[in-house]
């Protein structure tokens, strides 16, 4: 395993994230899927980079996260780990275990977790689910692999839900989420993502757990926040969910740049003499 990025001074660890929660310092998380973006995020001071199975959507154009494979996740993870290592090496890198790589059996989950960790040298893995995967989380953490949980809206279960609406609005589902959060912490998870749940419920979970909560569409009371980097940069002009704050409009910037390049090439304005050998 390539662990050279983990040995750089100031590298964010699971212990560091726990300290941040205890000290009231918010945790910043963004997704990345390639070397260049990983370098930019690490240089900008992001705490955690999530190599999300959302690559299935934003990188490969699938409608859901379900089609992405272990091999594809390893490909993206290797690129991100190299990017962090070649920059400051500060950011923690967490990788999603893709759909059906951990749900079939505990033994298969353990083999796949080991395969993902060994092939790219990331810091931790993320799994979706509560009670149903708690034993799997324990088995993985027991062999020394850190696990981040994920509750609320779980994109790998989208066909079960039928929509991407807010979860745990009813009392029964909210109580189950609270129980699942406790079980994940007891199983050894070092943090848990809370996706698209009521802000008040996220605040309750955050207060209840000793491990950090990372929100996405879960209000401001979580210990940290995660978003898809393509969304905050405005790269997808059709996607504007309520929980995303767009910090740039790179879709328009790129569009104008490409149009200018096309015009320059067509009109013979590129390359100029000082751009030639």
UniProtKB/Swiss-Prot annotation:
<comment type="similarity">
    <text>Belongs to the PanB family.</text>
</comment>
<keyword id="KW-0479">Metal-binding</keyword>
<dbReference type="GO" id="GO:0005737">
    <property type="term" value="C:cytoplasm"/>
</dbReference>
<keyword id="KW-0963">Cytoplasm</keyword>
<feature type="active site" description="Proton acceptor">
    <location>
        <position position="195"/>
    </location>
</feature>
<comment type="function">
    <text>Catalyzes the reversible reaction in which hydroxymethyl group from 5,10-methylenetetrahydrofolate is transferred onto alpha-ketoisovalerate to form ketopantoate.</text>
</comment>
<comment type="pathway">
    <text>Cofactor biosynthesis; (R)-pantothenate biosynthesis; (R)-pantoate from 3-methyl-2-oxobutanoate: step 1/2.</text>
</comment>
<feature type="binding site">
    <location>
        <position position="96"/>
    </location>
    <ligand>
        <name>Mg(2+)</name>
    </ligand>
</feature>
<protein>
    <recommendedName>
        <fullName>3-methyl-2-oxobutanoate hydroxymethyltransferase</fullName>
        <ecNumber>2.1.2.11</ecNumber>
    </recommendedName>
</protein>
<feature type="binding site">
    <location>
        <position position="53"/>
    </location>
    <ligand>
        <name>Mg(2+)</name>
    </ligand>
</feature>
<dbReference type="Pfam" id="PF02548">
    <property type="entry name" value="Pantoate_transf"/>
</dbReference>
<dbReference type="GO" id="GO:0015940">
    <property type="term" value="P:pantothenate biosynthetic process"/>
</dbReference>
<keyword id="KW-0566">Pantothenate biosynthesis</keyword>
<feature type="binding site">
    <location>
        <position position="96"/>
    </location>
    <ligand>
        <name>3-methyl-2-oxobutanoate</name>
    </ligand>
</feature>
<comment type="subunit">
    <text>Homodecamer; pentamer of dimers.</text>
</comment>
<dbReference type="InterPro" id="IPR015813">
    <property type="entry name" value="Pyrv/PenolPyrv_kinase-like_dom"/>
</dbReference>
<feature type="binding site">
    <location>
        <begin position="53"/>
        <end position="54"/>
    </location>
    <ligand>
        <name>3-methyl-2-oxobutanoate</name>
    </ligand>
</feature>
<dbReference type="GO" id="GO:0003864">
    <property type="term" value="F:3-methyl-2-oxobutanoate hydroxymethyltransferase activity"/>
</dbReference>
<feature type="binding site">
    <location>
        <position position="128"/>
    </location>
    <ligand>
        <name>Mg(2+)</name>
    </ligand>
</feature>
<dbReference type="InterPro" id="IPR003700">
    <property type="entry name" value="Pantoate_hydroxy_MeTrfase"/>
</dbReference>
<dbReference type="InterPro" id="IPR040442">
    <property type="entry name" value="Pyrv_kinase-like_dom_sf"/>
</dbReference>
<keyword id="KW-0460">Magnesium</keyword>
<feature type="binding site">
    <location>
        <position position="126"/>
    </location>
    <ligand>
        <name>3-methyl-2-oxobutanoate</name>
    </ligand>
</feature>
<keyword id="KW-0808">Transferase</keyword>
<dbReference type="GO" id="GO:0000287">
    <property type="term" value="F:magnesium ion binding"/>
</dbReference>
